[in-house]
Amino acid sequence: MNRIMGIDYGLKRIGIAITDFLRITASPFDTVKNVSLKKNALKILEIAKNRDVSIIVLGLPLNMNGTEGGMAETVRKFIEKIKFLSDIEVTTVDERLTTVQAERMLIEEADISREKRKGIKDKVVAALILQTYLDIQSDE
């Protein structure tokens, strides 16, 4: 069984998480710099190929009322670019409050300083996005 990749697509950084081969746990993997839609998509697809990923799950940033804001449009453009370059399956999950949850985890549970959180937060958010997807799949 191939792995699943979770992505937190941000304006400056892209957080990446990957499951184990059994698709049970989501683990933070890496954070890459956001360069351009095409370069970002190529980098993600390269990692996906090297890590035997068959599904990519992106967090879709929704407003608290459930509507899509400007960043959701950017995420959808990124999805279009990935689909243009590859036939890998791409899906989304609601990522509302995952950044807040990650911040809280890193401060309260891991006691990580603000400076160190910058480099870790994005991939932790990606892991939360991916775990949300896994939880939804296990409920179906």
Curated annotation (Swiss-Prot):
The lineage of its organism: Bacteria, Pseudomonadati, Elusimicrobiota, Endomicrobiia, Endomicrobiales. Signal peptide: none annotated. It comes from the Bacteria. InterPro entries: RNaseH-like_sf (IPR012337), YqgF (IPR005227), YqgF/RNaseH-like_dom (IPR006641), YqgF/RNaseH-like_dom_sf (IPR037027). CDD domains: YqgF. One of its GO terms (biological process) is rRNA 5'-end processing. Keywords: Cytoplasm, Hydrolase, Nuclease, Ribosome biogenesis. It is found in: Cytoplasm. Could be a nuclease involved in processing of the 5'-end of pre-16S rRNA. Belongs to the YqgF nuclease family. Its EC number is 3.1.-.-. Pfam families: RuvX. It comes from Endomicrobium trichonymphae. The keyword Manganese does not apply. This is Putative pre-16S rRNA nuclease. One of its GO terms (molecular function) is nuclease activity. GO terms for cellular component: cytosol. PANTHER family: POLYNUCLEOTIDYL TRANSFERASE, RIBONUCLEASE H-LIKE SUPERFAMILY PROTEIN.
